[in-house]
């Protein structure tokens, strides 16, 4: 029995053929962003709950950030870290750094997740050349042996995409299980990231016109790929969740149609719904739940609210 063939056939049936032809698997971040500029330019792309930018504006803002990198001497293969919560700015950097030919590493930004000593070990271990931070991390970043920039730093002039291939490293996924004196992470190429983002398209339900809240941090590989890049692939509107403690207020306000969560968060959200009522989850059609074991009871609880909870 050819399991691979059967699996491919099963997943391909989840998307209409004419839609699938419009969403080929791209090899690099650069190719994905070019498609977004051409096909989604006027659609809303990213929102911080107050300001919303279109895909055309996102493309231009990423290009200006690339020029900032070039102007500050970064070259192909340099590793650049970002220490900041989910925001419009950190999302721009997550895509600007690889399209400049550099390698991005998103660091966990939860309180006390990264100490000064751990950050120093990280910089030395990975030979990090630059660090973008939110202002609240100034103390941790002070005195580090690396160029430090504010998360808002950018240029007024756009810069071109670098000459990258699918085999060039794009992202280092920092492991949360690191010991402070021996940090490590997985190095993922442009091609690997794009394959994973494309694989995320194959779910039941409609492909386009989705709204999501990026709740999982970009330092979480599942959150960065399925929670952001797959949504970018389909021209979805992505709300940046800057503070996870606010999701109880953000969900009914933003009315997302799809969420990417870990089981603990899914359980919490469903528990809140039992208290606040079904209206709390109004609009949500799908929850993709991964990163850890998901109990069958969560699937049933979600189904009771008319939500398709997909484990994987």
Identify the residue ranges that each predicted region occupies.
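ANL superfamily adenylate-forming
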Residues: 130-168, 194, 272-273
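A short helix-loop-beta submotif of the ANL/AMP-binding
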Residues: 66, 79, 85-109, 126-129, ...
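Conserved AMP-binding/adenylate-forming core of the ANL superfamily
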Residues: 21, 25, 34, 42-73, ...
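AMP-dependent adenylate-forming
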Residues: 6-14, 31-54, 170-172, 181
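Conserved pre-ATP/AMP-binding loop-to-beta segment of ANL
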Residues: 24, 156-177, 181-182, 205-211
């Amino acid at each position: 029995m050819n399991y691979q063939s059967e699996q491919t056939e099963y997943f391909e049936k989840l998307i209409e053929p004419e839609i699938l032809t419009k969403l080929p698997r791209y090899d690099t971040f650069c190719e994905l962003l070019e498609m977004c500029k051409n096909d989604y330019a006027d659609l809303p792309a990213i929102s911080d709950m107050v300001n919303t930018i279109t895909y055309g504006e996102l493309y231009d803002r990423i290009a200006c950030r690339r020029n900032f990198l070039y102007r500050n001497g970064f070259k192909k293969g340099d590793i650049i870290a970002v220490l900041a919560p989910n925001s419009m700015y950190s999302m721009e950097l997550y895509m600007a750094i690889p399209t400049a030919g550099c390698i991005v590493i998103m660091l966990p930004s939860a309180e006390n997740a990264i100490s000064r000593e751990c950050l120093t070990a990280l910089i030395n271990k990975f030979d990090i050349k630059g660090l973008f931070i939110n202002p609240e991390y100034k103390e941790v970043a002070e005195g580090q042996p690396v160029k430090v920039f504010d998360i808002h730093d950018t240029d007024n002039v756009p810069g071109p995409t670098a000459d990258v291939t699918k085999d060039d490293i794009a992202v280092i996924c920092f492991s949360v299980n690191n010991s402070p004196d021996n940090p490590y992470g997985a190095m993922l190429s442009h091609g690997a990231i794009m394959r994973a983002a494309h694989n995320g398209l194959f779910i039941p339900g409609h492909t386009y016109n989705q709204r999501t809240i990026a709740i999982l941090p970009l330092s979480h590989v599942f959150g960065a790929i399925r929670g952001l890049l797959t949504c970018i692939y389909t021209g979805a509107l992505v709300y940046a969740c800057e503070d996870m403690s606010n999701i109880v207020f953000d969900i009914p306000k933003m009315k997302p149609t799809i969420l990417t969560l870990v089981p603990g968060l899914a359980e919490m959200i469903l528990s809140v719904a039992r208290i606040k009522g079904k209206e709390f989850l109004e609009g949500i059609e799908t929850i993709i739940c991964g990163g850890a074991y998901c109990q069958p009871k969560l699937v049933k609880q979600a189904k009771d609210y008319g939500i398709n909870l997909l484990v994987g």
